[in-house]
């Protein structure tokens, strides 16, 4: 068997599994084909340049339809802002912009389409620039990363050393920059002048808020106030702190501030304020309040003790004097002792008496009008509460006489009872619900003594039997009045007129207010310190204290007490509250000689509450809707001038005065007179109702003032200032009026 020779057969070629060169070749071919396709698509979409308008062929017209469709699609995407860096290279709108045939509508150019194409071209151009920038950035970043990787692999140690050197250089540069940025002098940064242009004045803001466009309410003078010195100021609710006039006090306060120890910044400020306040208060005390311990707030009530539960209404308190106390205490003690003895005798009944009589007697004592001191005198006479009661101690009176201390205790206690009654029951100048309260009826003393006297038991038993018999008779009479239904009804007896009538008698008809409560005036002494028209504004006392000090020094002299006149109300009816309160009561019967021990007042207030500086209460503003009124002032002036109808008279007078000369000027011509009230009423004929609502009298008067300045009119008011009369003024001859007439 012959062996086949190997030379006649071709060698077998095995394909390589990973051929990099072949793969690169295929990738290049694919990319080349894609580029050709893109170029061909772009070239097909571009219209060929027309050499002339006349050289038009059916071939060009056939290609015009896809070009227009692509153009409209690209414009739509451009207007919708759908062009970005990824699809910007697929639009060929920039290449078609030079072709004006796409922008024409017949013979005219569609500028709206041209503006849209220009906007789209700008968007495509900017997006292409962005895409180029991003692609180049990616390329540069990739190259930089590759170079860094190669440097790290090849030069590992050298790269670390270079990085350390770079970090050291950066640290050195930062240190140098920190020195440059710091400011050596702080004064260069400090703001010397504050920018106050943007800030607004709160008073100006309030004035603008209160401004009213309607008329005179919005004027500036109507929003200003007058202070106690007569100055016109804004309505600010800040308290004014007056500077001290005593320079010595200021010097002492400054020395105290300098000598004060300073530990820190915070303690320094607190010590300064403390020293200033103490020194100023000491100086004020030395100047004004040196003799404050010897003064009394209200000398007429010096020996009076107020009740904690009662009302301290000064208008209801009566000034007490020593001689009046002597007169009242004697009668008061006699009356109270008699009444208390009688009441005690009525209460000292035997144990066999009923409890109802005792309760009735207590009610009598409680509601007895002639004995208002029952609840006060027993307390003063109680020996357990007053251990010194009964000891005969004498008190020297002003006139040299003596008075027992027991009587003085009873008198002061009785006076307390009087004022407690007035404070609780009559503090509002009327009885209130107690006016209709049913009070217990008084019984005769003989009947009470026969019932409660244990000595006359026989008489009491007879009276009791009589009372029982009377009650039995009444019950029998009530039982005898039985109705018999079997008897015939007497018609005449049924219809007989009754003796008693249901109507009120005629005597009560005139007194129709007899069953009504009295008028509730609710008088209060604080009304003396308030204004009538502005009740929230209180009259402040004399804050200066200059004239008041001299008055107090004159009054404090004990030798001149007899010459002091009572500080009552003036004869002309004017009561000046700032000059002080009448120290001897409101009546004319009190005189200064009756109260020699009482010192005159040195303060001008009713109590401690009025010593504080009271702020002026701001009235509550009503929140109401404001509507801006729109008035044409020029039209209003024209209509008012027509209503006045003075133009013809002015022209006639000017012509006559020009012709006749000075003789006509000297004579007084009878000028027509128009009233402001009538002219304003004539506006109703020219304006509609809606427009007339916006026109106020202030607007009309302002327009009349303008007309008076322009046409030389004379304004005069009547006697009661209720109306203004308008007439032409003198010397109205002008050359301009004559030229206009000619």
UniProtKB/Swiss-Prot annotation:
Single GO molecular function:
chromatin binding
Subcellular compartments: Nucleus; Cytoplasm; Chromosome
Residues of the signal peptide: none
Keywords of this entry: Cell cycle, Cell division, Chromosome, Cytoplasm, DNA condensation, DNA damage, DNA repair, Mitosis, Nucleus
Under InterPro entries, the record lists: Condensin_barren_su2
- Which source organism does the UniProt entry give? Schizosaccharomyces pombe (strain 972 / ATCC 24843) (Fission yeast)
Q: What is this protein called?
A: Condensin complex subunit 2
Q: Where is the composition biased (Polar residues)?
A: 53-62, 452-470, 592-604
**One GO BP:** attachment of mitotic spindle microtubules to kinetochore
Cysteine pairs forming cystine bridges in this chain are none
The UniProt annotation puts the region (Disordered) at: 1-62, 151-172, 452-473, 564-604
Question: What do we know about how this protein assembles, alone or with others?
Answer: Component of the condensin complex, which contains the cut14/smc2 and cut3/smc2 heterodimer, and three non SMC subunits that probably regulate the complex: cnd1, cnd2 and cnd3.
* Compositional bias segments (type: Acidic residues): 154-165
Please state which protein family the record places this protein in.
Belongs to the CND2 (condensin subunit 2) family.
Coarsely, its chief localization is: nucleus
Q: What does this protein do?
A: Regulatory subunit of the condensin complex, a complex required for conversion of interphase chromatin into mitotic-like condense chromosomes. The condensin complex probably introduces positive supercoils into relaxed DNA in the presence of type I topoisomerases and converts nicked DNA into positive knotted forms in the presence of type II topoisomerases. The condensin complex probably also plays a role during interphase in processes such as DNA repair.
* Any one annotated GO CC term: cytosol
User: Where does the record place Basic and acidic residues bias?
Assistant: 21-39
Pfam families in alphabetical order: Cnd2
């Amino acid at each position: 068997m012959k062996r086949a020779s190997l030379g006649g057969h071709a060698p077998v070629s095995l394909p390589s599994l990973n051929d990099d060169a072949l793969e690169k070749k295929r990738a290049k071919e694919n990319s080349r084909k894609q580029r050709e396709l893109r170029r061909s698509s772009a070239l097909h979409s571009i219209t060929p340049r027309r050499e002339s308008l006349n050289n038009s062929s059916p071939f060009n017209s056939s290609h015009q339809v896809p070009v227009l469709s692509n153009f409209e699609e690209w414009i739509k995407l451009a207007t919708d802002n759908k062009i970005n860096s990824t699809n910007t290279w697929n639009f060929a709108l920039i290449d078609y912009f030079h072709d004006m045939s796409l922008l024409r509508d017949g013979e005219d150019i569609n500028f709206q389409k041209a503006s849209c194409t220009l906007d789209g071209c700008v968007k495509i151009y900017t997006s292409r620039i962005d895409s180029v920038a991003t692609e180049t950035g990616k390329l540069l970043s990739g190259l930089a990363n590759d170079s860094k990787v190669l440097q790290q692999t090849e030069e590992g140690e050298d790269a670390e050393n270079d990085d350390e050197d770079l970090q050291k250089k950066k640290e050195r540069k930062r240190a140098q920059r920190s020195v440059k940025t710091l400011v050596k002098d702080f004064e260069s940064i400090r703001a010397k002048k504050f920018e106050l242009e943007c800030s607004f004045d709160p008073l100006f803001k309030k004035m603008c808020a209160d401004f009213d466009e309607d008329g005179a309410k919005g004027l500036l003078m109507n929003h200003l106030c007058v202070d106690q010195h007569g100055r016109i100021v804004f309505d600010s609710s800040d308290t004014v702190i007056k500077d001290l006039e005593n320079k010595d006090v200021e010097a002492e306060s400054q020395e105290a501030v300098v000598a004060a120890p300073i530990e820190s910044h915070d303690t320094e400020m607190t010590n300064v304020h403390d020293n200033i306040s103490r020194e100023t208060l000491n100086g004020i005390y030395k100047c004004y309040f040196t003799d404050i311990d010897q003064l009394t707030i209200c000398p007429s009530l010096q020996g009076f003790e107020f009740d904690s539960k009662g009302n301290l209404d000064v208008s209801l308190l009566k000034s007490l004097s020593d001689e009046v106390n002597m007169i009242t205490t004697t009668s008061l003690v006699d009356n109270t002792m008699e009444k208390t003895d009688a009441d005690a005798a009525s209460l000292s009944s035997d144990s066999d008496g009923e409890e109802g009589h005792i309760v009735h007697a207590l009610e009598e004592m409680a509601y007895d009008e002639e004995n208002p001191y029952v609840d006060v005198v027993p307390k003063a006479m109680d020996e357990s509460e007053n251990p010194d009661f009964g000891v005969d101690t004498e008190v020297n009176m002003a006139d040299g006489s003596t008075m027992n201390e027991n009587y003085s205790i009873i008198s002061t206690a009785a006076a307390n009872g009087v004022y407690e009654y007035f404070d609780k029951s009559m503090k509002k100048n009327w009885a209130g619900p107690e006016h209709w309260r049913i009070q217990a009826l008084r019984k005769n003393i003989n009947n009470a003594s026969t019932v409660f006297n244990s000595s006359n038991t026989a008489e009491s038993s007879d009276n009791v039997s009589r009372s029982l018999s009377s009650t039995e008779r009444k019950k029998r009479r009530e039982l005898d009045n039985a109705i018999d239904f079997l008897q015939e009804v007497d018609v005449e007896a049924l219809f007989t007129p009754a003796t008693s009538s249901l109507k009120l008698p005629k005597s009560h008809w005139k007194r129709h207010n007899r069953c009504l409560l009295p008028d509730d005036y609710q008088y209060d002494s604080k009304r003396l310190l308030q204004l009538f028209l502005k009740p929230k504004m209180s009259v402040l006392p004399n804050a200066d204290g200059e004239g008041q000090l001299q008055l107090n020094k004159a009054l404090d002299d004990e030798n001149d007490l007899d010459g002091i006149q009572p500080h009552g109300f003036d004869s002309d009816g004017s009561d000046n509250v700032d000059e002080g309160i009448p120290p001897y009561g409101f009546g004319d019967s009190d005189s200064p000689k009756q109260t020699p021990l009482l010192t005159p007042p040195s303060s001008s207030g009713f109590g401690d509450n009025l010593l504080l500086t009271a702020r002026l209460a701001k009235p509550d503003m009503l929140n109401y809707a404001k509507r801006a009124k729109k008035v044409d002032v020029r039209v209003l002036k024209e209509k008012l001038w027509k209503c006045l109808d003075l133009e013809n008279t002015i022209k006639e007078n000017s012509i006559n005065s020009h012709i006749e000369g000075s003789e006509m000027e000297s004579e007084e011509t009878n000028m027509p007179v128009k009233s402001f009230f009538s002219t304003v009423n004539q506006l109703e004929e020219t304006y509609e109702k809606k427009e007339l609502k916006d026109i106020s009298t202030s607007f009309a008067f302002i327009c009349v003032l303008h007309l008076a300045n322009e046409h030389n009119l004379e304004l005069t008011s009547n006697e009661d200032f209720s109306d203004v009369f308008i007439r032409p003024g003198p010397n109205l001859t002008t050359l301009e009026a004559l030229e206009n007439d000619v």
